[in-house]
Amino acid sequence: MKYILVIFIGLSLLSCRKRLDSFLFNGSKLESYQLDNYTGEVSLELNGQFAVPDSLIHRVHFPVVIDGETVQVQGVYVGDTNHINQDTVILYCHGNKDHMDFYWCREKLYANIGGLGRYGVLMFDYPGFGLSEGTATENNMYAATSSAISWLKDRGLSNDRFVMFGFSLGSAPVCEVAGHSSDYALQPSKIILEAPFASAEIMIQDAALLSMPGSFLVDLKIDNATEIKKVNVPLLWIHGMADSFLSMSSHGQLVYDNKTGVKESVLVPGGEHETTPFVMGYQAYIERLAAFIQS
């Protein structure tokens, strides 16, 4: 009877494999981006703070080659696109949910680091999210990130003025790029990880409370805890201590501990997965980011 139960559970888990992969890439499609006019759920409620004028908001897109076909990935650049060859630019890689409208509030926050317009900020939707074409997969996410970096380099950005910021799922492309600099058009001078996950395997084991390889449940190969060992640029790690989605102790702490060289941490009591900037206080949050970028 015991062996029959094990076989039944195994077959049930295999049937969920596609669903679990989809859960980690939980994007939603749109007919159009609304940004400030979006009425759906958002990552943070800014309540009118940190406004960005229309003159600094630029819808952009860039080509990504996926399986031999060229698709278009959509992005939003906040800043003066004519000054990318002079400005320091933050490439923001968002989390696993919905699309850029959900994370637009965060891009506005980052556009106010050091004062409005001090830094350019580029955010983009991964393939399969929002209006970005293609299918949501790990490799396609990396390909889109590479194209975003090339878009910035083509406009004059250099390594010393390039900062990457990854939130949640977005920690994967940041660690990938920073750990494999020769494969990308630019190498970030600093990286920021907020609520990163250690690996797909640990994420699944945490969720399922099962001691089995994560590869049994998902196709993802993401392993930030290993990739971070290859990163030799300064790291700022931010994590809410009440994060129940990606536990600080089993995810962020492991990534941080595996990073050698210059690193800083900000651990926020009471901060949950999405709420850490709010709990910390928006102004204190962006001032801490500014201090790291300017150091």
Name each region found by the language model.
Residues 12-65:
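An N-terminal hydrophobic leader/cap segment in hydrolases
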Residues 62-149:
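Membrane-embedded segments
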Residues 105-106, 224, 233, 247-257:
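Short alpha-helix in the alpha/beta-hydrolase fold that links the catalytic acid
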Residues 166-174:
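Gly/Ala-rich beta-loop-alpha elbow adjacent to hydrolase catalytic centers
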Residues 173-227, 277:
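Hydrolase active-site cap/lid region
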Residues 231-232, 236-243:
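Short beta-strand/loop motif that positions the catalytic acidic residue
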Residues 242-246, 273-275:
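Acidic catalytic loop of the alpha/beta-hydrolase fold
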Residues 253, 261-295:
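C-terminal catalytic histidine-bearing segment of alpha/beta-hydrolase fold enzymes
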